[in-house]
Amino acid sequence: ELGWEFYLRPENDAHKIGNHIWEIGLKYGMILTGTPVFRARRIEAGLMGTTEFDSTTTPFDAGLGHFVQMDKQNFIGREALEKADKRSRTFGMRVLGGIAERGRTISIGDDLIGTVCSSTWSPYQECGVALVRMDDPEKGPSTEVKVTGTDGKTYSAKLCSLPMYDSEGAIARGKNTTIPNGPQPWK
Protein backbone atom coordinates (compact mmCIF):
# COMPACT_ATOMS: atom_id res chain seq x y z
CA GLU A 1 0.00 0.00 0.00
CA LEU A 2 3.01 2.27 -0.16
CA GLY A 3 2.38 4.61 -3.06
CA TRP A 4 3.56 7.72 -4.80
CA GLU A 5 2.00 10.51 -6.80
CA PHE A 6 4.01 12.37 -9.42
CA TYR A 7 3.40 15.99 -10.34
CA LEU A 8 4.98 17.18 -13.57
CA ARG A 9 5.25 20.47 -15.37
CA PRO A 10 3.29 20.95 -18.62
CA GLU A 11 6.52 20.85 -20.64
CA ASN A 12 7.44 17.37 -19.28
CA ASP A 13 6.54 14.33 -21.39
CA ALA A 14 4.29 12.67 -18.79
CA HIS A 15 3.61 9.65 -21.02
CA LYS A 16 7.33 8.96 -21.54
CA ILE A 17 8.15 9.46 -17.86
CA GLY A 18 5.21 7.25 -16.81
CA ASN A 19 6.28 4.45 -19.16
CA HIS A 20 9.85 4.62 -17.85
CA ILE A 21 8.71 4.44 -14.21
CA TRP A 22 6.39 1.55 -15.11
CA GLU A 23 9.17 -0.44 -16.87
CA ILE A 24 11.57 -0.04 -13.95
CA GLY A 25 8.85 -0.57 -11.33
CA LEU A 26 7.72 -3.89 -12.81
CA LYS A 27 11.12 -5.34 -11.89
CA TYR A 28 10.33 -4.54 -8.25
CA GLY A 29 6.74 -5.79 -8.21
CA MET A 30 5.09 -2.41 -8.71
CA ILE A 31 1.37 -2.50 -9.48
CA LEU A 32 -0.95 0.25 -10.70
CA THR A 33 -3.72 1.33 -8.39
CA GLY A 34 -6.24 4.09 -8.39
CA THR A 35 -8.83 5.95 -6.39
CA PRO A 36 -10.37 2.90 -4.62
CA VAL A 37 -7.05 1.93 -3.02
CA PHE A 38 -6.29 5.48 -1.93
CA ARG A 39 -9.83 5.84 -0.58
CA ALA A 40 -9.38 2.64 1.46
CA ARG A 41 -6.08 3.82 2.90
CA ARG A 42 -7.53 7.27 3.71
CA ILE A 43 -10.49 5.74 5.55
CA GLU A 44 -8.36 3.17 7.39
CA ALA A 45 -5.99 5.93 8.51
CA GLY A 46 -8.90 8.08 9.71
CA LEU A 47 -8.04 10.94 7.34
CA MET A 48 -11.14 13.02 6.82
CA GLY A 49 -12.21 14.84 3.69
CA THR A 50 -15.22 16.76 2.48
CA THR A 51 -17.80 14.03 3.15
CA GLU A 52 -16.85 13.88 6.84
CA PHE A 53 -17.68 17.54 7.50
CA ASP A 54 -20.72 19.77 7.25
CA SER A 55 -21.67 23.15 8.71
CA THR A 56 -22.59 21.56 12.06
CA THR A 57 -19.40 19.52 12.60
CA THR A 58 -17.13 20.73 15.38
CA PRO A 59 -13.44 19.84 15.68
CA PHE A 60 -14.44 17.78 18.73
CA ASP A 61 -17.01 15.77 16.73
CA ALA A 62 -14.28 14.89 14.24
CA GLY A 63 -11.78 13.84 16.91
CA LEU A 64 -9.66 16.93 16.21
CA GLY A 65 -10.32 18.75 19.48
CA HIS A 66 -6.66 18.51 20.51
CA PHE A 67 -5.91 21.11 17.81
CA VAL A 68 -8.26 23.67 19.37
CA GLN A 69 -6.43 26.10 21.64
CA MET A 70 -9.17 27.06 24.07
CA ASP A 71 -6.61 28.97 26.15
CA LYS A 72 -6.21 31.52 23.33
CA GLN A 73 -7.69 34.84 24.32
CA ASN A 74 -10.26 35.12 21.54
CA PHE A 75 -11.10 33.57 18.18
CA ILE A 76 -14.13 33.24 15.92
CA GLY A 77 -16.35 30.41 17.13
CA ARG A 78 -14.85 30.23 20.62
CA GLU A 79 -18.21 30.72 22.38
CA ALA A 80 -19.83 27.90 20.39
CA LEU A 81 -16.88 25.56 21.01
CA GLU A 82 -16.95 26.28 24.74
CA LYS A 83 -20.55 25.00 24.80
CA ALA A 84 -19.87 22.03 22.48
CA ASP A 85 -19.62 18.42 23.59
CA LYS A 86 -15.88 17.70 23.71
CA ARG A 87 -16.20 13.99 22.89
CA SER A 88 -15.39 12.59 19.45
CA ARG A 89 -18.31 11.20 17.45
CA THR A 90 -16.21 10.00 14.50
CA PHE A 91 -15.15 6.36 14.32
CA GLY A 92 -14.18 3.67 11.86
CA MET A 93 -16.51 0.84 10.92
CA ARG A 94 -15.78 -2.61 9.51
CA VAL A 95 -18.60 -4.16 7.45
CA LEU A 96 -18.71 -7.94 7.14
CA GLY A 97 -19.17 -9.05 3.52
CA GLY A 98 -20.15 -5.75 1.92
CA ILE A 99 -19.56 -2.03 1.54
CA ALA A 100 -21.70 0.47 3.48
CA GLU A 101 -23.44 3.03 1.31
CA ARG A 102 -22.33 6.60 1.98
CA GLY A 103 -25.06 8.73 3.56
CA ARG A 104 -26.92 5.74 5.00
CA THR A 105 -27.90 5.61 8.65
CA ILE A 106 -26.42 3.13 11.09
CA SER A 107 -28.79 1.29 13.41
CA ILE A 108 -29.08 -0.91 16.45
CA GLY A 109 -32.48 -2.56 16.22
CA ASP A 110 -34.98 0.18 15.32
CA ASP A 111 -32.77 2.98 16.67
CA LEU A 112 -30.93 5.12 14.10
CA ILE A 113 -27.66 6.03 15.78
CA GLY A 114 -25.29 7.45 13.16
CA THR A 115 -24.40 8.09 9.53
CA VAL A 116 -21.89 6.68 7.05
CA CYS A 117 -19.65 9.55 5.87
CA SER A 118 -17.46 7.62 3.40
CA SER A 119 -16.85 3.97 2.58
CA THR A 120 -15.08 1.48 0.33
CA TRP A 121 -13.67 -2.06 0.27
CA SER A 122 -10.38 -2.74 2.05
CA PRO A 123 -8.26 -5.37 0.32
CA TYR A 124 -5.92 -5.29 3.33
CA GLN A 125 -8.64 -6.05 5.89
CA GLU A 126 -10.83 -7.99 3.43
CA CYS A 127 -14.02 -6.20 4.48
CA GLY A 128 -15.89 -2.98 3.85
CA VAL A 129 -14.51 0.00 5.78
CA ALA A 130 -16.13 3.33 6.56
CA LEU A 131 -15.77 6.58 8.45
CA VAL A 132 -18.93 7.18 10.47
CA ARG A 133 -20.40 9.99 12.57
CA MET A 134 -22.37 8.77 15.57
CA ASP A 135 -25.22 10.69 17.20
CA ASP A 136 -24.10 9.47 20.64
CA PRO A 137 -20.33 9.51 21.35
CA GLU A 138 -20.83 6.62 23.79
CA LYS A 139 -21.63 4.37 20.82
CA GLY A 140 -18.00 3.89 19.83
CA PRO A 141 -15.45 1.11 19.26
CA SER A 142 -16.78 -2.46 19.56
CA THR A 143 -20.43 -1.35 19.13
CA GLU A 144 -22.17 -3.83 16.82
CA VAL A 145 -24.53 -2.23 14.30
CA LYS A 146 -26.47 -2.79 11.08
CA VAL A 147 -25.99 -0.77 7.90
CA THR A 148 -27.31 -0.80 4.33
CA GLY A 149 -24.72 -1.69 1.70
CA THR A 150 -24.13 -0.34 -1.78
CA ASP A 151 -26.08 -3.36 -3.07
CA GLY A 152 -29.15 -2.52 -0.93
CA LYS A 153 -28.63 -5.44 1.48
CA THR A 154 -28.37 -5.04 5.25
CA TYR A 155 -24.99 -5.93 6.77
CA SER A 156 -23.60 -6.47 10.25
CA ALA A 157 -20.77 -4.14 11.16
CA LYS A 158 -18.64 -3.17 14.13
CA LEU A 159 -17.35 0.28 15.07
CA CYS A 160 -13.61 0.64 15.67
CA SER A 161 -10.99 3.18 16.66
CA LEU A 162 -9.04 5.24 14.14
CA PRO A 163 -6.63 4.60 12.62
CA MET A 164 -7.93 1.11 11.96
CA TYR A 165 -4.38 -0.26 11.88
CA ASP A 166 -0.80 0.95 11.44
CA SER A 167 -1.07 3.52 14.23
CA GLU A 168 2.74 3.88 14.12
CA GLY A 169 2.67 4.88 10.42
CA ALA A 170 4.93 2.05 9.19
CA ILE A 171 3.17 1.89 5.80
CA ALA A 172 3.53 5.60 5.08
CA ARG A 173 7.23 5.43 6.04
CA GLY A 174 7.85 2.39 3.81
CA LYS A 175 8.64 0.07 6.74
CA ASN A 176 5.68 -2.19 5.95
CA THR A 177 5.44 -3.01 2.25
CA THR A 178 3.10 -6.01 2.46
CA ILE A 179 0.79 -6.17 -0.56
CA PRO A 180 -2.63 -7.65 0.32
CA ASN A 181 -4.03 -10.41 -1.87
CA GLY A 182 -7.67 -10.13 -0.78
CA PRO A 183 -10.72 -9.73 -3.02
CA GLN A 184 -11.12 -6.44 -4.86
CA PRO A 185 -14.78 -5.94 -5.79
CA TRP A 186 -14.22 -2.70 -7.72
CA LYS A 187 -12.54 -4.56 -10.62
Question: What is each stretch, according to the model?
Answer:
Residues 1-187:
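Conserved, structured C-terminal
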